[in-house]
Amino acid sequence: MHEDAPKMSIAQSLAASTSQPKGDIVTEIPLEFAMSSMETKSIETTNVELKITYVDPTTGTGGEPGAYLPTAGTVCDQTDTKDVIEELCPVCGDKVSGYHYGLLTCESCKGFFKRTVQNKKVYTCVAERACHIDKTQRKRCPFCRFQKCLDVGMKLEAVRADRMRGGRNKFGPMYKRDRARKLQMMRQRQIAVQTLRGSLGDGGLVLGFGSPYTAVSVKQEIQIPQVSSLTSSPESSPGPALLGAQPQPPQPPPPPTHDKWEAHSPHSASPDAFTFDTQSNTAATPSSTAEATSTETLRVSPMIREFVQTVDDREWQNALFGLLQSQTYNQCEVDLFELMCKVLDQNLFSQVDWARNTVFFKYLKVDDQMKLLQDSWSVMLVLDHLHQRMHNGLPDETTLHNGQKFDLLCLGLLGVPSLADHFNELQNKLAELKFDVPDYICVKFMLLLNPEVRGIVNVKCVREGYQTVQAALLDYTLTCYPTIQDKFGKLVMVVPEIHALAARGEEHLYQRHCAGQAPTQTLLMEMLHAKRKS
């Protein structure tokens, strides 16, 4: 079955979006000429300031696009105030009115909780005790609403039994500690963002190309979760309830009971399935899942939402298993290494197709696009497999139609099974950091938009795209994972380890190719040769 993959170069793949209309006569162009001369339509560039929303600690104002980070002074010099952070009710997402029964909640949920406890009401759920609770439908199922009140930390013992106004005010010290923690977190977030802005120059972040994100707001609505845990947890570490209220990445589902991981796996985190909640977390309670739905959606910047929409895991699965099935149908035995090369080649075409449609990459000329892809293709493939294993439960192997076992882990290692232990250690590190889909797609953009790649012409656009994604990821990690110390920095430190795995895999593939053991005239082999020519 030594049939070659389609003879299509990376330049031809990238130029597909600007190809001539059907019916025109197209002359074949030599590979070297095509790679050096083809380019996309020239686009007029403009400098557009990236509007990172800033909330003034002294007033609590700002927040609309156009409120820029201050250019002078430090955040630490600002005074404390009651309204530094806009709060959202952890039960329904409505505006918080104050501390009620051990937690910051809205007036509606406060009254509902008090009436339920004082009147000793007993509710039933007509559905499956997993009703979605938000501002618009919080009255539909009182059972699930009350359960969610308890889950997020509202205290039964704080409700007065005599039905008089006012609660049992034994939580005062806790409220003060929580306010101090909240202000400290806000300072750390603003200092980190301003430090990043300062490292990029006094001019702030500037987009050097037309972009739909000319007014990206990366301000996040922060609800400090489960303050009642402070009564029983040390000040230096959040309690279990606090950790439970943090956004959790989808947990890998249990391994399939059969050997074959079907292409229609229900664990796919496709854009339709991934709505910034923990739908894939099989250990999550219904109420915690509903809480994530109502609060975490508000924490994610529009740019990261748009990035996540480019992740199509369903298509990734269909392409992978569709190719494995088609290549082994009515075959007694196949060369598994050659099959792996065909899968990698298909993955590369998918990488090119994904990249050329992304907001930053598509404005570059084809020469620059080629150089960026030639530098990053292998590390992005390794990252993709980490993502599939962590978020979609991709198993280590699958059984082909002819009964042979295909090593999916080895596929992610580019054919070097001896790197499996290192790969698993890397996966464990990411799991400890609660590596989720927004993290994954931002890191992937940062791998692609590497301004240090030699030979690129429009370094300015590449660097600005990289810095924009970097700033969005920093803001996301500080906002959604405040309890993970320096999550952003630790993610950045993991990147060289992914590069090391990819480099070992590349070298292995190149050696096999030189020994005549791999298909020729494929995009995979073109990539391997291109990096050695640069």
From Swiss-Prot:
Q: Which PROSITE patterns match?
A: NR_LBD, NUCLEAR_REC_DBD_1, NUCLEAR_REC_DBD_2
The record places its NR C4-type zinc fingers at 89-109, 125-149
Show the InterPro entries listed in the entry. Answer: NHR-like_dom_sf, NR5-like, Nucl_hrmn_rcpt_lig-bd, Nuclear_hrmn_rcpt, Znf_hrmn_rcpt, Znf_NHR/GATA
Function per UniProt: May play an important role in development.
Q: What is the lineage of its organism?
A: Eukaryota, Metazoa, Ecdysozoa, Arthropoda, Hexapoda
Indicate what this protein is called per its UniProt record. Nuclear hormone receptor FTZ-F1
Natural source organism: Bombyx mori (Silk moth)
SMART domains per record: HOLI (SM00430), ZnF_C4 (SM00399)
What biological processes does GO assign it? hormone-mediated signaling pathway; tissue development
Question: What family does the entry list?
Answer: Belongs to the nuclear hormone receptor family. NR5 subfamily.
